[in-house]
Each structure stands twice: as structure tokens, then as C-alpha cells.
């Protein structure tokens, strides 16, 4: 008993004082580059189109920021904003995951679509947002793409689609896979009408999206070092029993092997698209 008393008396007595510096920077003020880890002011980064000042890494843009960057002020008209996913297979927890992503992103689904003008030229646009279910393609994403393509076909508008996706949405099973064929049919009608489709592939674009509408543009563009592919690198290596090149499935690798027309730095994105639309308009007229 006395031994325990003396042992207790030897214990250090102290108070934990919280570091006041921990809360000096409000949330959202700073952003860390996922590539070089440099910390930058979010406002300045946004003004630079989310391109890192230090390593030139192209950090993901939200769907609305992307549209804002390539459209005249106030010209964007959104289509089908209220369309949301059901749970056709009664997949456990799917509704909760959708609701969580809706709250986190402010989006109803992984794609925003509509019409806009760029330097006065009207066009249809669809932009995938990888923050929502990793940009996976389900029934709503496929339906929204088809609706905007069909609108462009009817009104004879060029169409631009920005891909950013992990592939088909597993929670919707075969219904998600059906969107690959469904979107391709709409694009075929658009093409048969003699209209322009620009596929702009961003990081990452994989799975069923890379194997369908992302790869069949009249002009296929991409951003530097974007990951583009169908199956994962490890799966391919195990299947063919060979080591793949270090730059395999990058935009630069695909450009070198003829699968892309050009890799565009984000600062040149608006000007490049404007020039293409102007040329198409002149030829069409």
C-alpha cells in the first residue's frame, strides 16, 4: 500500500495546452497539390484553372468550373439538373452513398450537361465530375449524355464532352453497361448528321467510359499526364506476363501511338476549343 503511494507521487503532473496555431487557417483557404505537395492559396489556384504553380500538375476541375472556363459569361443553360439515380438492383447502401455525394458536391449526379456559347458560337456540352461516385457511369449519366447529344443533333450543334470517370457503376449492374451502347448510338446519329463531336479526356478516364464515348470523338483531346485506359495496369501485366512502359496509359503515350489528336495544357483549352468551333462553323456554312 505504501509502495503504491510513493509510486503515484512520482508521476508527472501536467496540463495539455492546445496549439493555437492549429486553427489559424480556415478550411478551404489553402490547397495542397496532390503531385508535389506544395501548399497554395485556393483562390490563386482557382484563378490559374487549378494548375499547380510549382509542378504544373493539372488538379481536377469541378464540372461547373470547367464549363465556366470554356463558355461566354451567362451563356450556359443546364439540362436535366433534377435527374437522380434510382436503385434498380436494390444494392445495399446505394441510396445512402448517392445522398452523401449529393451533399458533398452539390450535384445530383456525376455529369452536368447543357448548351453554352464560346466566342458567340453555340454548342452542346457535357462534363463529368469525378467527385461524385468517382464519375462512374450509371443510368442517369447515360441518359443525360444521350439527351444532350440528341438535342445537338436536332438543332445542328457541335458537341463537346469532358470525360473523368472510373468506369461503369457497379451498383447498377448490366444497366450501367448498357449505357456504353446507348451513348454510342446517339453519337452515331449525331455523326451521320455531319456534326462535330469533340471528346476531351481528363484524368482519370477508365473502364467502360474509355471504351465507349470517350474514345470515338471526331477530335480526341486530353490534358497532360491524364490516366486513360480500360483495365488496370496490374491486371494487364498479369494477363500478358510482361512489364509495361512507365508512361503506359498516359495521355502522352496515347498521343504517340495515334489514339489522341493533341494533348492540351489547360491554359490553352478555351482558345483551342474556340478555334476548332470556328473552323467547323466556317466549313459547315
From Swiss-Prot:
This is Acetyl-coenzyme A carboxylase carboxyl transferase subunit beta. One of its GO terms (biological process) is fatty acid biosynthetic process. Pfam families: Carboxyl_trans, Zn_ribbon_ACC. Keywords: ATP-binding, Cytoplasm, Fatty acid biosynthesis, Fatty acid metabolism, Lipid biosynthesis, Lipid metabolism, Metal-binding, Nucleotide-binding, Transferase, Zinc, Zinc-finger. GO terms for molecular function: acetyl-CoA carboxylase activity; ATP binding; carboxyl- or carbamoyltransferase activity; zinc ion binding. Disulfide bonds: none annotated. Component of the acetyl coenzyme A carboxylase (ACC) complex. Biotin carboxylase (BC) catalyzes the carboxylation of biotin on its carrier protein (BCCP) and then the CO(2) group is transferred by the transcarboxylase to acetyl-CoA to form malonyl-CoA. Acetyl-CoA carboxylase is a heterohexamer composed of biotin carboxyl carrier protein (AccB), biotin carboxylase (AccC) and two subunits each of ACCase subunit alpha (AccA) and ACCase subunit beta (AccD). Its main location: cytoplasm. NCBIfam families: accD (TIGR00515). It comes from Staphylococcus epidermidis (strain ATCC 35984 / DSM 28319 / BCRC 17069 / CCUG 31568 / BM 3577 / RP62A). The gene is accD. Pathway: Lipid metabolism; malonyl-CoA biosynthesis; malonyl-CoA from acetyl-CoA: step 1/1. It is found in: Cytoplasm. A zinc finger (C4-type) spans 33-55. Signal peptide: none annotated.
Amino acid at each position: 500500500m505504501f509502495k503504491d503511494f510513493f509510486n503515484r507521487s512520482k508521476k508527472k503532473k501536467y496540463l495539455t495546452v492546445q496549439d493555437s496555431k492549429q486553427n489559424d487557417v480556415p478550411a478551404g483557404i489553402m490547397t495542397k497539390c496532390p503531385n508535389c505537395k506544395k501548399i497554395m492559396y485556393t483562390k490563386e489556384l482557382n484563378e490559374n484553372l487549378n494548375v499547380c504553380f510549382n509542378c504544373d500538375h493539372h488538379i481536377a476541375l469541378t464540372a461547373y468550373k470547367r464549363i465556366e472556363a470554356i463558355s461566354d459569361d451567362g451563356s450556359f443553360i443546364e439540362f436535366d439538373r433534377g435527374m437522380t439515380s434510382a436503385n434498380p438492383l436494390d444494392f445495399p447502401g446505394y441510396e445512402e452513398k448517392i445522398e452523401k455525394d449529393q451533399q458533398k458536391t452539390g450535384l445530383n449526379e456525376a455529369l452536368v450537361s447543357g448548351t453554352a456559347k464560346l466566342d458567340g458560337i453555340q454548342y452542346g456540352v457535357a462534363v463529368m465530375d469525378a467527385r461524385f461516385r468517382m464519375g462512374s457511369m450509371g443510368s442517369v449519366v447515360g441518359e443525360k449524355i444521350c439527351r444532350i447529344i440528341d438535342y445537338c443533333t436536332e438543332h445542328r450543334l457541335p458537341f463537346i464532352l469532358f470525360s473523368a470517370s472510373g468506369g461503369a457503376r457497379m451498383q447498377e449492374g448490366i444497366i450501367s453497361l448498357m449505357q456504353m451502347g446507348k451513348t454510342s448510338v446517339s453519337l452515331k446519329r449525331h455523326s451521320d448528321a455531319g456534326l462535330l463531336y469533340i471528346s476531351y479526356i481528363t484524368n482519370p478516364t477508365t473502364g467502360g467510359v474509355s471504351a465507349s464515348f470517350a474514345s470515338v470523338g471526331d477530335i480526341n483531346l486530353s490534358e497532360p499526364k491524364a490516366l486513360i485506359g480500360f483495365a488496370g495496369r496490374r491486371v494487364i501485366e498479369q494477363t500478358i506476363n510482361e512489364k509495361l512502359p512507365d508512361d503506359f496509359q498516359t495521355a502522352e503515350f496515347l498521343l504517340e501511338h495515334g489514339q489522341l489528336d493533341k494533348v492540351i495544357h489547360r491554359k490553352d483549352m478555351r482558345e483551342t476549343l474556340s478555334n476548332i468551333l470556328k473552323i467547323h462553323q466556317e466549313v459547315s456554312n
